[in-house]
Amino acid sequence: MEQKYYHMNIVGCERDLPLCPLNEHLMIGAFVIFGDPELTTACAAELLRRVPAYDYIITAEAKGIPLAHEMARLAGNQRYLLARKGPKLYMRHILDVSVHSITTDREQHLYVDGEDAARMKGKRILIVDDVVSTGESLHALETLVNEAGGIICGRACILAEGEAANRSDLVYLEKLPLFDAAGNPLD
């Protein structure tokens, strides 16, 4: 079967997203910012213009990392926080929550180090990710922030996929449709 693509213009950057089957009836556009500094920087700069004031950014491992890093760098080398997919030996007093993502077929957990959790207490936290689809990963990050005593001041992503584009609490740059099995956008 020939690979199908979905063409997008994201803040002036033209990209062709390969379509990948999610199941026998549905495909998604694969959006990957790893290794794409032009797109990452352009998206980070535009999101910074649109998001509310915040004290810290938090993202989930792994695809949100380049975006959070670049947003923090552009905002003056601010510290950002990372929810890991697995606990690390150096992490102490870990907070963790479970998450189900559209791109994984099993339950996952997100973990935040106790020091980062302490940083969030009473602070305005901006949750950032590359793509929001079902909102499950976003919900897991919200739970971590709330358990740490942080104040969620906003949620931002590059692409809002499917129904996520209808969320009133989400700042995003572009809509990404879901696709039928033939690769046609479902709008």
Per-region residue spans from a language model:
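Active-site-facing substrate-recognition patch
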Residues: 1-54
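PRPP-dependent phosphoribosyltransferase catalytic core
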Residues: 2, 7, 139-187
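Short glycine-rich phosphate-binding loop at a beta-alpha junction
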Residues: 54-61
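Conserved acidic residues
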Residues: 55, 123, 153
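Gly/Ser/Thr-rich loops at beta-strand to alpha-helix junctions
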Residues: 61-67, 134
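Short Gly/Thr/Asp-enriched flexible loops that form oxyanion-binding sites at enzyme active sites
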Residues: 67-75, 141-142
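A short helix->loop->beta-strand "cap" motif at the edges of active sites that frequently abuts
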Residues: 76-78, 149-150
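Short, glycine/charge-rich flexible loops or terminal/linker lids adjacent to PRPP-binding catalytic cores
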Residues: 78-125
